[in-house]
Amino acid sequence: MNETQIQRETRQVVEDVLEKTNLKQGALFVLGLSSSEVLGGQIGKESSQEIGELIVETILGILGSRGIHLAVQGCEHVNRALVVERQVAEQFGLEIVSVHPTLHAGGSGQLAAFKFMQDPVEVEFIKAHAGLDIGDTAIGMHVKHVQVPIRPILREIGHAHVTALASRPKLIGGARAHYPQDAIRKS
């Protein structure tokens, strides 16, 4: 698999998702990543530290330039805990948990986050404003209600299926209620 192509596809997808979700500075963005799926393998079976680092470093650069915080979801072997900067955990009142990821418990994305973040910690849950799922890792539990599916410009990064989610406030009220225009769907 060509690393330049993976980096280019990652950049394209993330920039497209950010444009479609209209995220503001200070927002939380969750990443679910299966490097095995990117390489054409089965999730959890062919993890690649190099691919994890390539993708996470690329995404951190894009989000960091916009003031958006990254949370990297781990696999079920760490109960889908997430790596965030300690400052983010404190700012959002997130409970820090004790686990250090490995390639096969947490995954390559979490290891990369521990490498590239300034002061990484693991937290059990978040309510992100949006997120990107590379390889069908199931990020929905970490995106706040109401989740809105986003169709990325590319359907795959490498060989991994790609989906994205945004969120919007709940529409409450009855027949007389009026709602502001939805910045995500714009209709």
Curated annotation (Swiss-Prot):
Domain of life, per lineage: Bacteria
Protein family per UniProt: Belongs to the UPF0340 family.
Protein name: UPF0340 protein SPT_0687
InterPro entries (UniProt xref): Antibiotic_NAT-like (IPR028345), DUF436 (IPR006340)
Pfam family, one: DUF436
Residue stretches spanning the membrane: none
Lineage: Bacteria, Bacillati, Bacillota, Bacilli, Lactobacillales
Range of residues in the leader sequence: none
